[in-house]
């Protein structure tokens, strides 16, 4: 069925006011979207971050009158509206559309990420079947791709791999399929832990091969290989902790880092690692090295 979509161009300071007002006048959903394709944001603690220029999208039943919606918003907020528009959009099978656009992808020489509803293009390759669920990591983002290609290029046979910030579990599971003896995944999000567990089962990974923990429950360890695809801020602040999680002679790969943040992150690890040249792709970087 069709819907009336209302779009408002707002600042972060206006977000809560207009979200509440839209719900008050009958919106069935309200969504925040980046208005300027800003690649990333890193919030301060105890804040609810938004992009500096944000679009607020609200859906109403198709018979809602947009002019009445706008009039009520003016009354509720006591102010003139920011830039705004309304249009009728047709309903779609969004899940099917997304599934159609998520195709098998190759990383490095051996590794393929294959959506669980697709046939593997190369039966004899290392095929990781993925159902990303809430899209914690599918391989489509440059940072995930950089980490997957790095894993494909390593000799992982018999190693223990730590995936710090595991999300969908894609990196930990890839490491196991590429020969790692065991993997450990940790994430602050319980849903990420569940997504990782589901994807491991889908790929026939035995429970004893992949241990998943919230950070506060993770045991003391030193891994042969650590991969962390998170954000530059945490990578810098956690550098002593992450460095300590890699055994001497072990390997490290970091991403989730914008190109302009690369030198700062590399500097945080330079004292403990012999670092490789930074690899850049589409404005994102990968930092890797070997523990001294």
From Swiss-Prot:
Subcellular localization, as worded in the UniProt entry = Cytoplasm
What are its E.C. numbers? 2.1.1.-
Q: Which residues take part in binding S-adenosyl-L-methionine?
A: 144, 165, 187, 229
The record's Gene3D superfamilies line, in alphabetical order, gives: Vaccinia Virus protein VP39
* Catalysed reaction, written as an equation: L-lysyl-[protein] + 3 S-adenosyl-L-methionine = N(6),N(6),N(6)-trimethyl-L-lysyl-[protein] + 3 S-adenosyl-L-homocysteine + 3 H(+)
Record GO biological process: methylation
Which key words are in the record? Answer: Cytoplasm, Methyltransferase, S-adenosyl-L-methionine, Transferase
Q: What class of enzyme is it?
A: transferase
Transmembrane recorded as keyword: no
Q: Which SUPFAM superfamilies match?
A: S-adenosyl-L-methionine-dependent methyltransferases
The molecular function GO annotations come to: protein-lysine N-methyltransferase activity
Highest taxon, organism lineage: Bacteria
Please indicate if the UniProt record lists Cytoplasm as a keyword: yes
Q: Name the principal localization, coarsely classed.
A: cytoplasm
Instruction: Give me the Gene Ontology terms describing cellular component.
Output: cytosol
InterPro entries tied to this protein: Ribosomal_L11_MeTrfase_PrmA, Ribosomal_PrmA_MeTrfase, SAM-dependent_MTases_sf
Task performed by this protein: Methylates ribosomal protein L11.
The UniProt entry's sequence similarity note says: Belongs to the methyltransferase superfamily. PrmA family.
Entry's PANTHER family?
A: ELECTRON TRANSFER FLAVOPROTEIN BETA SUBUNIT LYSINE METHYLTRANSFERASE
Q: Which NCBIfam families match?
A: prmA
- Please identify the protein, giving its name as recorded: Ribosomal protein L11 methyltransferase
């Amino acid at each position: 069925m069709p819907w009336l979509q209302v779009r408002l161009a707002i600042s972060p300071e206006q977000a809560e006011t207009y979200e509440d007002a839209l719900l008050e006048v009958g919106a069935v959903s309200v969504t925040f979207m980046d208005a300027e394709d800003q690649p990333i944001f890193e919030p301060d603690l105890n804040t609810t971050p938004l992009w500096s220029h944000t679009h607020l999208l609200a859906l109403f039943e198709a018979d809602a009158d947009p002019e009445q919606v706008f009039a009520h918003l003016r009354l509720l907020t006591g102010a003139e509206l920011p830039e705004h528009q309304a249009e009728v959009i047709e309903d779609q099978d969004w899940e099917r559309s997304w599934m159609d656009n998520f195709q098998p992808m190759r990383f490095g020489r051996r590794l393929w990420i294959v959506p669980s509803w697709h046939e593997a293009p190369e039966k004899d390759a290392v095929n990781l079947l993925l159902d990303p669920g809430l899209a914690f990591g599918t391989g489509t983002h440059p940072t995930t791709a950089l980490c997957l290609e790095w894993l494909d290029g390593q000799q992982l046979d018999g190693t223990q791999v730590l995936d710090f910030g595991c999300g969908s579990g894609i990196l930990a599971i890839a490491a196991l399929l590429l020969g790692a003896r065991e993997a450990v995944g940790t994430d602050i999000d319980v849903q990420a832990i569940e997504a990782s567990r589901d994807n491991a089962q889908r790929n026939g990974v035995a429970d004893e091969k992949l241990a998943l923990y919230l950070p506060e429950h993770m045991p003391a360890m030193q891994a042969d290989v650590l991969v962390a695809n998170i954000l530059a801020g945490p990578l810098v602040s956690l550098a002593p902790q992450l460095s300590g999680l890699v055994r001497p002679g072990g390997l490290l790969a970091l991403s989730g880092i914008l190109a302009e943040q690369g030198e700062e992150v590399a500097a945080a690890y330079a004292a403990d690692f012999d670092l490789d040249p930074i690899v850049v792709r589409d404005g994102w970087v990968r930092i890797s090295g070997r523990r001294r």
